[in-house]
Design a protein with these regions (language model features):
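Active-site-adjacent helical/loop segments in soluble small-molecule enzymes
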Residues: 1-43
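Phosphate-binding loop/pocket of nucleotide- and phosphate-handling active sites
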Residues: 30-101
């Protein structure tokens, strides 16, 4: 079992690796973290979590988490989206600024 906060934090942690998980997969990831932390899955073992839903169906939830707009959750792993125009140069400039290039 996983709380709303545990699933949101687990999904946010996965977001930082380039994934875009749904809350259902967030539950599975949160439980995986719990099993690893409790030693039921050791550091030498491998585990696979199969995501069967698409995070795009839950964009409002994910944006709410990362923008800190979910009153019942503190967004401890928020990664606030940056909105840019649909323009290559604007995107490139922002990437350069964020990466120090």
């Amino acid at each position: 079992q996983a709380t709303e906060r545990e699933l949101a934090d687990a999904a946010a942690k996965a977001d930082r690796t380039g994934m875009y998980n749904c809350p259902h997969t967030g539950v599975a990831l949160a439980v995986l973290i719990k099993l690893r932390n409790s030693g039921q899955i050791s550091g030498s073992e491998r585990a696979v979590v199969i995501s069967t839903a698409n995070g795009l169906k839950f964009t409002d939830f994910k944006l709410g988490y990362h923008r800190g707009l979910l009153p019942e959750l503190s967004s401890t792993l928020s990664n606030v989206p940056i909105e840019l125009s649909n323009d290559y140069d604007a995107v490139r400039k922002q990437v350069d600024e964020l990466t120090g290039l």
